[in-house]
């Protein structure tokens, strides 16, 4: 069951998705824009994070502009190993998304690293640690969209 959010929560969520203030006191700036106190903004964001609605607040970077590469990976993982496999994959800092899919290749994740060699090394480690050797890597050749905005 999704936690209840009110109109003020929605206004905060809409604002911080793409216009998070880069100031010394960002929550004060958000409050000023929305007619709230800094303390109320912090409390609401804390509650939204504690309830799992907000996963993280932080910067998003374009990997290619920083010299990094990215790939979409898929694994054919036995049902009884899915949780273990996902846990091991999630230990890698360059993993940004990790999903179970209803497919022969049933785990899909994205990985970013300074080089394809590093990605290949990480995938080899994952295979060794999990025993899952049916992994594919589909390196990005062109980025069409990297930003999602959810208007609430």
Which residues does each PLM region occupy?
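A compositional/biophysical signature of low hydrophobicity enriched in polar/charged and small residues
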Residues: 1-152
């Amino acid at each position: 069951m999704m936690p209840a959010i009110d109109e003020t929560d929605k206004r905060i969520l809409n604002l911080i998705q793409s216009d998070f203030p880069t100031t010394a006191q960002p929550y004060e700036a958000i409050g000023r824009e929305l007619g709230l106190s800094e303390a109320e903004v912090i409390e609401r964001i804390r509650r939204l994070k504690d309830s799992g609605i907000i996963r993280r607040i932080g910067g998003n970077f374009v990997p290619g502009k920083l010299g990094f590469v990215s790939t979409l990976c898929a694994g054919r993982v036995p049902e009884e190993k899915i949780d273990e496999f996902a846990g091991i994959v999630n230990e890698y800092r360059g993993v940004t998304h990790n999903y179970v899919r209803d497919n022969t290749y049933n785990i899909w994740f994205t990985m970013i690293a300074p080089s394809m060699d590093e990605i290949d090394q990480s995938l080899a480690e994952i295979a060794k640690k999990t025993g899952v050797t049916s992994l594919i890597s589909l390196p990005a050749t062109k980025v069409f969209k990297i930003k999602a905005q959810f208007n609430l």
